[in-house]
Structure formats: C-alpha cells, structure tokens
C-alpha cells in the first residue's frame, strides 16, 4: 500500500508541475524524499524546471544523476536547447536499450529531428 501511495503522489506531483503548481509539487517531492523515493523526487524536480522553460537547469541537474530512466527527459532538454550533437549521442545510448518504450521514444525523437 505504501509503495502504491508513493507512486500516486509522484503522479499527482507530475501533473501539478504540468499545471504550474510547482510549490505543491515540491512539497510532495520533499515528502517522497523523506520516504527514500529519490528517483521520483528527481523526476518531479526535472519536470518542474522543464515546465517553467528552464531546460538548461534541468539538463544540468539531470546530468549529475545516475537514473537511466530519466535519460529521455534529458534528451528532451537537449532537443529544446538545440544541442544537436549531445542529443544524438544520448539517442545513440538510448537506442541500445532493450526497453521497447525507450526504442519508441528514440524513433519518435529521430523522426522529430527530420522535420
């Protein structure tokens, strides 16, 4: 039950960042931090920065982390910042993933880059 509650709270916080409820999302992130849910905390913080348009700070913060599941978020930052070679390097790393969702993301980003 506790894990399910943590997941639901993280989802609420992410929805909050998308609707510019950054303070509220940060409160949830702080609570999740106390519960040891660091990857969720970092995702909420990255999402908050990105939804404020601060892609440079999100990328800087994200590059310090060791959470492979956050790599697509960092690729989005590189895309928005026009960092083509960094983005291509990240997409090449992501393309080696066995996760079909990551493969779909990489293919979608590469299609987006063509336009």
Curated annotation (Swiss-Prot):
It comes from the Bacteria. Gene3D superfamilies: Tetratricopeptide repeat domain. Belongs to the YscG family. It is found in: Cytoplasm. Chaperone of the type III secretion system (T3SS), also called injectisome, which is used to inject bacterial effector proteins into eukaryotic host cells. Along with YscE, prevents premature polymerization of the YscF/SctF needle protein within the cytoplasm. Is also required for stable expression of cytosolic YscF and for YscF secretion. May act as a scaffold to organize the assembly of YscE and YscF into the heterotrimeric complex. Required for Yop secretion. It holds the Pfam family Type_III_YscG. NCBIfam families: type_III_yscG. It comes from Yersinia pestis. This is Type 3 secretion system chaperone YscG. InterPro entries: T3SS_YscG_PscG (IPR013348), TPR-like_helical_dom_sf (IPR011990). GO terms for cellular component: cytoplasm.
């Amino acid at each position: 039950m506790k894990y399910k509650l943590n997941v639901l709270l993280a989802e609420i916080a992410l929805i909050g960042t998308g609707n510019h409820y950054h303070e509220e999302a940060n409160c949830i992130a702080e609570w999740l931090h106390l519960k040891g849910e660091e990857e969720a905390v970092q995702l909420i913080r990255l999402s908050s920065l990105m939804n404020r348009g601060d892609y440079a700070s999100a990328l800087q913060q994200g590059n310090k982390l060791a959470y492979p599941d956050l790599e697509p978020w960092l690729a989005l930052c590189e895309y928005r910042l026009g960092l083509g070679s960094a983005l291509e390097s990240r997409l090449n790393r992501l393309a080696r993933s066995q996760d079909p969702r990551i493969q779909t993301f990489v293919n979608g980003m590469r299609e987006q880059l063509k336009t």
